[in-house]
Structures are given as structure tokens and as C-alpha cells.
């Protein structure tokens, strides 16, 4: 459960990310593909080269979904329902991959905003990404 302090930290951190979110999403995906090569199996049609248009486009989708989630911290299941259906029923992504991507998102944000990435912000963002992952895997049953 996200505390009021967590929600405040998440909104503040996301506000500092601003227009860089799509680039950070793409960077986090590239980081995940390089660090955890098995995750590439869900993207066989992607050009995996650095900065490819497909990775950039999917990074924007990831960032947009997270921005939606930040705007609906009190009702993530409703806000992410369609995305949850897509990942559970059509894409059938292994739920473990959400944890891997979450880690790569945290690393990416820490690299770009080291002064703002305090232990409190890190903890709040980690809880937020864990909640998003839980919602995205909730319809797998």
C-alpha cells in the first residue's frame, strides 16, 4: 500500500522526469534486453540495436503507461485494466519480467537524477513499480 508520503514522492519524482519519460522508457528497455537477454523473446520482430525506432516507440508506451499510473495512484487496477488484459491474455508475458523491467527503470532514473534519487524516493518508486507489476499480473489467474 502506498502511503501519502509515497504518493507525494512518486508525483514529485515523476514531475522531475517530465518530457524525458519516453527516452528513459526506451533506455530502461535497452538496459533490460542487454542485462536479461531472455526478455528479448517477447520482441522477436524488434530491431534490438541501440536507439532503434521500435525500442523508442515501446519505451514511449511504457512511459505513457507509467504516467497514467502516476495520475491514478489511488486506483491503479482501473487505470491499468486494459494493459493488464493485454499482457495476461494476448501477450502472455512472464510475470517475472515486470520485476526485471522495474529494476531497469529504477537504475535508469538513478543514473539520470542521482541528486534526486534519495533512499526515500527510491523506496517509494520501488513500491510504486511493484504495485504496477502486481496490477499487470493480476489477470493471469
Curated annotation (Swiss-Prot):
Residues bearing PTM Phosphoserine: 3, 35, 49, 102, 124, 138
Entry protein name: Hemoglobin subunit alpha
A Pfam match: Globin
The protein's assembly and partners: Heterotetramer of two alpha chains and two beta chains.
PANTHER family xrefs: HEMOGLOBIN FAMILY MEMBER, HEMOGLOBIN SUBUNIT ALPHA
Statement: the UniProt record of this protein carries the keyword Metal-binding: yes
Modified residues (N6-succinyllysine): 7, 11, 16, 40
Modified residues (N6-acetyllysine): 16
Record's keyword terms, sorted: Acetylation, Heme, Iron, Metal-binding, Oxygen transport, Phosphoprotein, Transport
Binding site for O2: 58
Binding-site residues, heme b: 87
SUPFAM superfamilies (alphabetical): Globin-like
Highest taxon above the source species: Eukaryota
Cited function: Involved in oxygen transport from the lung to the various peripheral tissues.
Covalent S-S links between cysteines: none
Start and end residues of each Globin domain: 1-141
GO molecular function: haptoglobin binding; heme binding; iron ion binding; organic acid binding; oxygen binding; oxygen carrier activity; peroxidase activity
GO biological process: hydrogen peroxide catabolic process
Amino acid at each position: 500500500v502506498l502511503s501519502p508520503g509515497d504518493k507525494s514522492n512518486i508525483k514529485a519524482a515523476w514531475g522531475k522526469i517530465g518530457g524525458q519519460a519516453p527516452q528513459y522508457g526506451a533506455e530502461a528497455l535497452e538496459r533490460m534486453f542487454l542485462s536479461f537477454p531472455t526478455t528479448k523473446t517477447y520482441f522477436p520482430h524488434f530491431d534490438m540495436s541501440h536507439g532503434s525506432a521500435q525500442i523508442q516507440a515501446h519505451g514511449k508506451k511504457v512511459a505513457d503507461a507509467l504516467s497514467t499510473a502516476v495520475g491514478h495512484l489511488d486506483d491503479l487496477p482501473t487505470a491499468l485494466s486494459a494493459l493488464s488484459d493485454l499482457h495476461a491474455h494476448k501477450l502472455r508475458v512472464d510475470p517475472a519480467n515486470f520485476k526485471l523491467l522495474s529494476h531497469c527503470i529504477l537504475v535508469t532514473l538513478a543514473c539520470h537524477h542521482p541528486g534526486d534519487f534519495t533512499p526515500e524516493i527510491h523506496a517509494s518508486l520501488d513500491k510504486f513499480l511493484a504495485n504496477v507489476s502486481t496490477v499487470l499480473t493480476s489477470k493471469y489467474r
